[in-house]
Regions:
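Serine-hydrolase catalytic core recognition
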Residues: 1, 14, 85, 217-370
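Beta-propeller fold detector
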Residues: 64-67, 112-117, 161-166, 208-212, ...
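Glycine-rich, acidic and aromatic/proline-enriched surface loops and short helix-turn segments
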Residues: 52-61, 109, 306-310, 345-348
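Predominantly five- to eight-bladed beta-propeller fold
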Residues: 1-65, 250-262, 315-327
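Conserved beta-propeller blade repeats
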Residues: 1-5, 29-33, 37-45, 50-52, ...
């Protein structure tokens, strides 16, 4: 059985972008007059694609369209085969994106049954359907329904069997579930919004920390879930990659240590100092700064400030960011020239719960930078 998503863009308006000779590579045909790149693009309020989900029975060579109760302007961000051949999981979103439905569709009868409805305030984050994983007759995904992003465990009929993680912190990644041991592997910001650590939760609900270094940790697990590669870094430590045992977190081998890189760069880079402060409205924000090496607190210095603060983003992290911006090279150079370089994660940035992240809803450009 095959399944796919079909997009009918025939009624979607065309958007046009001018193109010029000075593009790279050079567009010689636009030497005297600019050209245009035309494509289908639904701006806010314009007609969306008509979306449908189809299946193809390889044995009988029959194509069918699922009877999916999707709004005319709705979305289908994901489809997943399950272990049950009569259940194809189809994820839908309304255009407002504050309601996510997970349907179990029969590929042959085309009937669709609602399994889970996720309705939250303002919008469903991408992490909800992006984290969705299926294991036998169960599935799991990350939801912020509690006010923070946590992992939830369902059976294929849509019954919630367990909230895997709990607390006033966000789960950042769901790595997978070990069917044999009943362990859920994930990363979270439990220790600090600036840091991540790798954990697993066992059958009894007990939590076990696998990463040992303080900073930013990310993992890639083997298909057997017995081993994982842990990539650790901090503001002062380039990435260190180790192979670890998934049951104990014990390091089995160091694959990359970047020792020489650290020795060569440390004398050249300025020191990131993390800080927090409260705005005039009492909102606590996180930031970092790099000061001149001969900094004198009694003197005044010009300040260069980097700001992004897009929804769910993070620039203030205890992580090695060399090679990115703001990563350290330019900032350290400007500090050597007598500037203080600062960066602040404004309102609406990530790892601080749903209320903080979604406060910029319908206020983009207003609250992000204040």
């Amino acid at each position: 059985m095959l399944a796919w998503i079909r997009y009918d863009e025939s009624k979607v308006p065309i958007y046009s972008i001018q193109e010029f000779k000075g593009a790279y590579p050079t567009r010689q045909e636009y030497d005297e007059y600019p050209g245009a790149y035309n494509y289908k693009y639904p701006v806010a309020g314009a007609k969306n694609s008509d979306v449908s989900v189809l299946t193809f029975d390889i044995k009988n060579r029959v194509t069918r369209t699922l009877k999916l109760p999707l709004d005319s302007d709705g979305y289908v961000p994901r489809i997943h085969f399950t272990s049950d051949p009569t259940k194809l999981a189809v994820v839908t979103l309304n255009r407002h994106q504050d309601r996510m439905d997970i349907y179990m569709a029969n590929p042959r009868s085309t009937e669709c049954k609602l399994a889970v409805r996720e309705e939250v305030n303002k919008y469903v984050p991408e992490s909800a359907y992006g984290s969705l994983k299926f294991y036998g007759d169960h599935f799991a995904f990350i939801s912020d329904r509690s006010g923070y992003k946590h992992l939830y465990w369902y059976n294929l009929n849509g019954k919630l069997e367990r909230q895997v993680t709990k607390g006033n912190y966000d789960v950042s990644d769901f790595y997978g579930y070990d069917v044999k041991t009943g362990r859920f592997f994930y990363a979270s910001h439990e220790e600090s919004p600036l840091r991540t650590a790798v954990y697993y939760t066992d059958k009894s609900g007990k939590k076990h920390k696998l990463s040992t270094e303080v900073g930013t940790n990310a993992a890639t697990f083997s298909t057997s879930m017995k081993y994982f590669m842990n990539i650790y870094s901090s503001a002062t430590q380039p990435p260190v990659t180790t192979l670890r045992d998934a049951a104990s977190g014990k390091a089995l081998s160091t694959m990359v240590d970047n020792k020489e890189l650290k020795e060569n760069l440390t004398p050249l880079l300025g020191q990131k100092e993390f800080f927090t402060f409260k705005t005039s409205e009492g909102v606590e924000l996180n930031g970092w700064m790099i000061k001149p090496r001969d900094f004198d607190a009694s003197k005044k210095y010009p300040v260069i400030m980097y700001q992004y603060s897009g929804p769910g983003s993070q620039e203030v992290r205890d992580a090695w960011s060399m090679g990115f911006y703001p990563g350290g090279q330019f900032e350290s150079y400007m500090a050597q020239q007598g500037f203080i370089f600062a960066c602040v994660d404004g309102r609406g940035t990530g790892a601080r719960g749903a209320e903080f992240e979604k406060c910029t809803y319908l206020n983009l450009g207003c609250l992000l930078y204040t």
